[in-house]
Structures are given as structure tokens and as C-alpha cells.
A protein has these predicted regions:
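Negatively charged, low-complexity tracts enriched in Asp/Glu with abundant Ser/Thr
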Residues: 2-36
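Acidic, low-complexity, intrinsically disordered interaction modules
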Residues: 24-109
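Intrinsically disordered/linker segments and immediately adjacent domain-edge residues
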Residues: 111-113
Length: 114
């Protein structure tokens, strides 16, 4: 069974900061469709490019083939203060982007019931 909780950009940013570790994936759904009750599934993941030791948060959105990328501090495995600021800023912009595409609401966070 899935539990759906509508989140604001602040809620999603804080969830990422408090819970996302390298290699983890957050799955979420949006109700950005013209069909009621139909959800599109996406993911948020931290990825590392080993050649550069660079880390990014990648958000798959708006139907495969497009991604939203948040750069992270290269020197840490945890979120430092700059990372937290980046995440908040970029997630706020991500919500604006989705709204500019005609989507009316925030992503729907989806959790698995244990």
C-alpha cells in the first residue's frame, strides 16, 4: 500500500537534506496529468562522477528523458551548509519550473508502508 503526502518545496527540500544519502533513491509521484487519479512516477538520486569526484542530485521529471540537476560540494559525503542552501534554492526553482509548464501543484511524495 502507498501513502501519499502532498509536500511543499520546503518539505521536499528538508526531506532530501535529512534523508537522502549517496546511492539512495527517493521515488515520488506527481498528479501532473489530465487524467484524474493517474500518477507519473519519478525519482531523486545522488550520483557521483568518479573522474571529477563531483556529486549531483538528479531529479527525473516531466516524463523520461529530462532531468533537473543540483550540484553538491565535491569534498564531503554529507550535506554541508552550502549544499543545504543549494538544495533549498534548486528545489524552489524546480517547483517554479513545474508550475511554468502548466502543472498546478507540488509533487506528491510517496512512501512504502512497512
Amino acid at each position: 500500500m502507498k501513502i501519499y503526502e502532498k509536500m511543499s518545496w520546503v518539505g521536499l527540500a528538508n526531506y532530501i537534506i535529512n534523508n537522502l544519502k549517496e546511492g539512495d533513491t527517493i521515488e515520488f509521484a506527481t498528479d501532473y496529468t489530465e487524467w484524474e487519479g493517474y500518477h507519473c512516477w519519478y525519482f531523486i538520486r545522488i550520483v557521483r562522477i568518479p573522474e571529477y569526484q563531483s556529486r549531483f542530485i538528479v531529479i527525473d521529471y516531466c516524463g523520461g528523458g529530462e532531468a533537473y540537476v543540483i550540484p553538491l560540494n565535491n569534498y564531503s559525503h554529507e550535506f554541508d551548509e552550502d549544499d543545504k542552501d543549494y538544495v533549498r534554492e534548486y528545489i524552489k526553482d524546480y517547483f517554479k519550473l513545474c508550475n511554468n509548464l502548466g502543472f498546478e501543484d507540488a509533487p506528491v511524495w510517496v512512501e512504502e508502508e512497512v
